[in-house]
């Protein structure tokens, strides 16, 4: 039996239903599962001395585009809004292949892990003609090499520019091709068991790049296969105009008409829902992945998170792709979310601790998982720890629950543990030679961008 003990943590912030915070306590994991939290001494061979540390549940990222890690900070797109931004970047993304996917995934997930992330959902929807094979497989290989909990998606686009959509022909597929590979991906990789390290959702890209038929058939197939549904929705006013002009409906009304609503569905962004639509999301348990930094960079708007939380809409936190973020740091996202809503909503804004819960138990809920997101006996041993005995955090531990929102910590964290195994130690990835990986990735970026 593999056992790991976090010993003598100054605080353990559990994010459990009672908002419990343990002080001067130990946390024991056995075969990847938490079996004890409390002050009593525990004996085991592998021990992390957590003296001075605050231990938190592992952060859960609910929307990403890992392939975009190799197209960040490009000067030609820095001042564009979504539609023009996408049109410019499709000309780069059409050159994706499995090698780029693997190394960009290692780079992006490695950054996330160094900053306390333990579960990542990735929305991969670009499958270039002639290079579509093996892309999702490369992501799972990268996740396995890093030792991370991976929730991938088989994304898709079939509505090209010639058919009235946004993407060029070079990055779209037929409905039949897409549905066949969706089924293959689920049958090959989706593990629905408790503490699963590999899961798959179906995730057509957006209403402006996917046909009505593909959206409808994807919803039917996902429910036949018992997997979840995800897409972008209500991200910009341009999208709203597109759907109104093409379909005669608002975006949520259109998606609901195709079966895209319910507790097995979550949308990325969700900025431009009206009040009635927010109530509909709450009634149906439909979730939203909040991506504040991306929304700010692309001038998309501010998601109505305070109202969502008040109504009971499930909300998770996400970094979005590195071409619109331009990074993979969920700790930074957490603090930005806190500050953005303080600016926008004052006393109605979520507290620093509320935002931590959005990034943990909230994110777990919209991914349909009750085995991760909080530190409780019987849940997965996914956590991270920050040593507060440093100049930057003097006095910050007076409110450990809110620290990550109010004071903030950009990382790297001192420890990240996934499934009861240490994946980051003293701020360094355990399963990766970071310097070598960075050199290889940098060389590949230059090659990829010159294609």
Outline where the language-model segments fall.
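His/Asp/Glu-enriched, well-ordered alpha-helical/loop segment
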Residues: 257-264, 306-390, 406-408
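Active-site gating loops and adjacent loop-to-helix segments of metal-dependent hydrolytic enzymes
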Residues: 70-101, 159-175, 196, 237-264, ...
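Acidic, glycine-enriched loop/beta-strand segments at the rims
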Residues: 12-24, 37, 298-299, 305, ...
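N-terminal metal-binding scaffold of metallo-dependent hydrolase/deaminase domains
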Residues: 1-43, 53-54
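C-terminal cap of metal-dependent C-N hydrolases
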Residues: 15, 380-438
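Alpha-helical scaffold segments that flank or form the walls of functional sites
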Residues: 28, 72-149, 180-194, 442-450
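Metal-coordinating catalytic core of metallo-dependent amide/deamination hydrolases
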Residues: 130-270
């Amino acid at each position: 039996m593999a056992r790991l003990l976090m010993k003598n943590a100054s605080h353990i912030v559990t994010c459990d239903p009672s908002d419990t915070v343990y002080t001067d306590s130990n946390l024991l994991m056995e075969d990847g599962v938490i079996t004890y939290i409390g002050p009593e001494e525990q004996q085991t061979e592998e021990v992390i001395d957590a003296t001075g540390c605050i231990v938190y549940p592992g952060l859960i990222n609910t929307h990403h585009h890992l392939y975009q890690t190799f197209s960040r900070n490009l000067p030609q797109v820095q001042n564009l809004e979504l539609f023009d931004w996408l049109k410019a970047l499709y000309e780069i993304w059409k050159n994706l292949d499995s090698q780029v996917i693997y190394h960009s995934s290692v780079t992006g997930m490695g950054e996330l892990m160094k900053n306390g992330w333990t579960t990542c959902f990735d929305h991969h929807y670009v499958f270039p003609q002639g290079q579509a094979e093996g892309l999702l497989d490369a992501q799972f290989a990268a996740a396995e090499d890093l030792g991370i909990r991976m929730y991938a998606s088989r994304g898709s686009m079939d509505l090209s520019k010639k058919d009235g959509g946004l993407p060029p022909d070079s990055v779209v597929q037929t409905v039949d091709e897409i549905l066949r590979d969706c089924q293959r991906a689920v049958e090959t990789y989706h593990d629905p068991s408790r503490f699963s390290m590999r899961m798959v959702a179906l995730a057509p890209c957006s209403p402006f790049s996917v046909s009505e038929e593909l959206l409808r058939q994807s919803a039917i197939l996902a429910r036949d296969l018992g997997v979840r549904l995800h897409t972008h929705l209500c991200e910009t006013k341009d999208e709203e105009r597109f759907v109104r002009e093409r379909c005669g409906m608002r975006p949520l009304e259109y998606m609901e008409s195709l079966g895209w609503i319910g507790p097995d569905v979550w949308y990325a962004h969700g900025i431009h829902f009206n009040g009635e639509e927010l109530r509909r999301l709450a009634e149906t348990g439909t979730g939203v992945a909040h991506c504040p930094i991306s929304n700010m960079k692309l001038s998309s708007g501010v998601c109505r998170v305070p109202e969502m939380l008040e109504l009971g809409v499930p909300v998770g936190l996400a970094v979005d792709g590195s071409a619109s973020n331009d990074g993979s740091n969920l700790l930074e996202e957490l603090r930005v979310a806190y500050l953005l809503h303080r600016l926008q909503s004052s006393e109605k804004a979520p507290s620093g601790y509320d935002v931590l819960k959005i990034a943990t138990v909230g994110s777990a809920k919209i991914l349909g998982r009750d085995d991760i997101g909080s530190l409780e006996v019987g849940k997965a041993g996914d956590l991270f720890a920050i040593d507060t005995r440093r100049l930057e955090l003097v006095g910050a531990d007076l409110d450990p629950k809110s620290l990550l929102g109010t004071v903030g910590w950009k990382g790297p964290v001192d420890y990240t543990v996934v499934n009861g195994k240490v994946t980051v130690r003293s701020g360094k990835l355990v399963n990766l030679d970071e310097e070598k990986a960075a050199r290889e990735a940098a060389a590949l970026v230059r090659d990829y961008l010159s294609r």
